[in-house]
Amino acid sequence: MMVTWSVSTVASCQHSCGRSRCSFENQPRLGGTIRLPARFSALKITRQQTIPRWSLSVYRLLLLILSLPGAPALAQNAIVLVGSGSSVPAPIYNRWTQEYGKQNRNIQMRYLAVGTSEGIKQISHGAGDFSAGEAQLTDKERKEGGLIELPVVLIAIVPIYNLPDVHQELRLSGEVLAAIFLGDVKTWNAPQIAKLNSEITLPSLPIQVINRPGGKGSNYVFTDFLSKVSSKFRAQVGVTASPKWPVGEAAERSSDMADKVRGTRGSIGFVEYQYAVKGSVAQAAVLNAGGRFVKASSESIDAACQAAEAPRWNNFSASLADAPGADSFPITSFTWIYLRTRSSESARTGALVDFLNWIYTDGQQYAAQEGYAALPAPLLAEVRKKVSNLR
């Protein structure tokens, strides 16, 4: 089906999004004719209408994605692939949108960060073409929702902190991190932390814990690691995208987490590596399974995947947390793209497969540039085989 949309601008934010300034303010609304899934039905979209709030209904999700600032102009009759999910991989999807769009004006992609759990819900209910996140699909989601997950790049969740008077590298183990986020370790000069940092004079500041609300992929990766290294954490919280944190205040988005920690003296939180780098916030070195304290980098993220056994690669939903190896960063994970295995729209399926083939070839070169790590070549070969079966 065809959808026509027009060009206009919004002079000020009327979205009731609660922000003092909104990214939609004074943004041009590009125009054109695009090809969308038949399930969206015929409608004429004009950007002279404003969106009342960040609704996640199918139609409003579509409107938001079509008007994302900075998106490349659409060719006539372009197929627009619509995706939503975790904010963790949002920067790499945005980069892929730009680079792929330069090469192919007939297939475009729009991605909106709404959280891992919400993204899975959207794709399960038929909204969009794919979703993305860091949580493993449940058997119910695979069977009843007809979904599969494929890894796209490697990510790391890093502990970040704000101790202005500490200039040396802070070291933390998984057990100490678990104790902090359980509320058992309450001050920065507690014996458990001091033992790992004998060369640092730690302040007697209370620890201000900052966590994430429910439905977030970074929660899943972080709790997966903490559950592997702490039996108490596993029993009290467990591996989940929606943990019931016993202490702390929540940061809604990954960028909010970096901002909160940077602005709160004595705080600790966790965020995807590239957000920590771009947010200029201090990162702790974490004790890995090889007995070394390692900081996150594209190299240490890659090392964790390389050190994992090959069967864990071939199981595309496998956990990489606490991987072996002296150089491995221990809070490493795949970030996945979630796809429906059944589609009646061959043109859209073909466009999606073309896009996937690109991200598993040319697209991988942008991973390290954006603060992630590319998938190892043997794993890429296996994933491409899976993609070829989607047609």
For each predicted feature, which ranges?
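Bacterial N-terminal signal peptides
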Residues: R60-G70
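Flexible loop/hinge segments at secondary-structure junctions
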Residues: A75-R391
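Low-complexity, intrinsically disordered or signal/transmembrane-proximal segments
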Residues: Q14-H15, Q27, Q48-Q49, Y59
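Residue-identity detector for glycine
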Residues: G18, R29-G32, G70
